[in-house]
Amino acid sequence: MILKYILPMLTLSSAAAGYSKGEKLLMEKKALLYEGKAKQIYAAEDERYFIMTYKDEATAFDGAKKGIIEDKGIINNRISCLLFKMLEEAGIKTHLVKQLDERNVLVKRMKMVPVEVVIRNVTAGSLATKLGIEEGLTLPMPIIELYYKNDDLHDPMINEYHAAAMGWANWEEIKEIQAIGLKINEILKRFFDDIGIILVDFKLEFGICDGQILLGDEISPDSCRLWDKQSLEKLDKDRFRRDLGGEAEAYREVVSRIEKNLSK
């Protein structure tokens, strides 16, 4: 059964109350630079940073299906910030600076690598469909897939040679990104296992800041397939994709388990 978890509501004004004048300036949104399916990116007062805002909109099948998941932006912001902090403590460099309020997070400005990294631990989704195999088979080793980020082309699958030849990243950067991805996978698999969740697969994005490769974007039920270990109930955006219902409750269940584990 999915447990209802009520997030504490934090407004921008209440969040700003504890900040210095300089820190409050960092929280001021300037020009909207980019709007995607689930987030908006704003310029910040300090040009070294962006402000990333999470939305409640949900999309699937390249935007063909659209809807709203109640408080999704709030929940995903919280989950992603908690997981990024945990990864930072484990030695993974990320774009996270600080969570500003319930929907907004301050991140480092960086040049994004236009390649999505998908890591799979269990057969599901397009992997099962393309290869004609059943869902739910535990893989003997993780599978890494690369996709060129291009909405018009529907994010085609590529390999390291495509990325290097097209100049999206050099060979060394791609290899480092893959190595970081595998390390993140090991950390997250153990963490989710401890809270009774199977990390089926997930998507990562990276960028380059001051010559360093940083983990960017988010890690949330929007970008991961998460199944309850006992019931195999889906706790991610597949509930929206497949019209299963209970999306908000599933997302709340994930953040509840994460917070309880990290508060020990």
Question: For the regions a protein language model found, what residue spans apply to each?
Answer:
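C-terminal helix-cap and adjacent tail motif
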Residues: 137, 219-264
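Conserved metal-phosphate-binding beta-hairpin within the catalytic cores
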Residues: 119, 199-217
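Classical Sec-dependent N-terminal signal peptides that target proteins to the secretory pathway
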Residues: 7-17
